[in-house]
Design a protein with these regions (language model features):
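Bacterial Sec-exported substrate-binding components of ABC uptake systems
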Residues: 3, 19-54, 153-184, 233, ...
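Bacterial N-terminal signal peptides
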Residues: 9-18
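Short helix-initiation/N-cap motifs at beta->coil->alpha
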Residues: 33, 87-98, 217-226
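Structured C-terminal subdomain patch of bacterial secreted/periplasmic proteins
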Residues: 45, 140-141, 145-148, 157, ...
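A short, structured surface patch at a secondary-structure boundary
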Residues: 45-103, 107-113, 213
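Alpha-helical, coiled-coil/dimerization segments enriched in small aliphatic residues
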Residues: 73-75, 193-221
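Short helices/loops that flank or line small-molecule/ion binding pockets
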Residues: 97-105, 123-124, 224-233
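Extracytoplasmic ligand-binding site segments that recognize negatively charged/polar headgroups
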Residues: 132-145, 184-200
Length: 297
């Protein structure tokens, strides 16, 4: 492997070791990015308006700690057959304060779309934090914290170790044989909106050593113009959210690119790749395997 490739891989993998999390443990408290804090202890009546947090609690076997949840419009929260039956406090973007209070929670976990709800909870002195998974490392840190919140530290550690093994295995494969591809994960096709480098999908692409052609564009869901698409000539395009079929990606400009000509168009599971639960590691493996096929064509 030449020096440039080694340096690129070093930069690709080193970011994981940077200590900066969306939730931090400081002096016996859990502190979020917005400086909200709660005590690091076991809770018994948790209201969650964060899909990733709901999935993590089920994976820990701590569903008995869930008092109620915020529901989603589009994507499903796993395990669907159980989460569909949970009491609701409304939508995750704007859960009802009245409904939250009706469940007498000792902890509320929100997502970044419901920050205004946090302002109301603060006035009512209801303990809450805002969870924002931006990096793979955040998932590991959240596992540690949620294990403490639910009294399931051993279970959290087991899931942590499994996820770490999956990530380390991917690292080893990439170090041995880099993908050297470029592409994008699209949000919608008309106009063509993609995930930038600051998103969780962007983080995954960076981890895999893939150049995100929308990485440096402005906005959280930047527009990829036809000129940019043709100029960058991506090796692949992946669809998420409202894009349900590879055929939806076959726009005229796309067909002029390597991705379109070679039909390197596929769909990723939005409920995994956009959600910071340990299920993401499985989707990363699938994404990697899809890219290996493309690389070897």
């Amino acid at each position: 492997m030449n020096i440039k490739k080694r340096f690129f891989l070093l930069l690709t993998f080193c970011f994981i070791s940077i200590v900066s999390y969306s939730l931090e443990i400081k002096d016996g408290m859990v502190v979020d990015k917005y400086n909200n804090s709660v005590e690091l202890k076991e809770y018994n009546r948790i209201v969650l308006a964060d899909p990733a947090g709901i999935e993590i609690l089920y994976m820990l076997g701590a569903e008995d700690k869930i008092a109620a949840i915020g529901k989603t419009f589009m994507s499903k929260i796993q395990p669907v057959e159980k989460t569909n039956k949970l009491p609701s406090v409304g939508n995750i973007t704007k859960p009802s304060i009245e409904k939250i209070l009706s469940f007498s929670p000792d902890l509320v976990i929100l997502n970044t779309m419901s920050i205004s709800t946090g302002d109301s909870l603060k006035k009512l002195k209801i303990p809450f934090i805002i969870s924002e998974t931006e990096k793979i490392d955040d998932i590991f840190k959240n596992l540690e914290i949620y294990g403490e919140f639910t009294g399931k530290k051993a279970e959290a550690d087991a899931i942590y170790q499994d996820g770490k093994k999956r990530v380390d295995t991917l690292k080893a494969k990439l170090e041995k044989e880099p993908l050297n591809l470029k592409g994008a994960i699209l949000y919608v096709t008309t106009p063509m909106l993609a995930f930038n480098d600051e998103s969780l999908p962007g983080e995954i692409m960076r981890f895999l050593g893939v150049k995100n052609i929308a990485g440096d564009l402005k906005g959280s869901r930047p527009i990829i113009s036809q000129d940019l698409l043709i100029r960058e000539n991506p090796d692949f395009l992946a669809g998420a959210m409202s894009i349900k079929s590879p055929d939806d990606l076959k726009k005229s400009a796309v067909l002029k690119t390597t991705a379109g000509k070679n039909e390197n168009l596929f769909i990723v599971d939005s409920s995994k790749i956009l959600r910071g639960s340990p299920r993401l590691f499985e989707e990363m493996e699938k994404f990697y395997n899809e890219l290996v096929i493309i690389k070897n064509k």
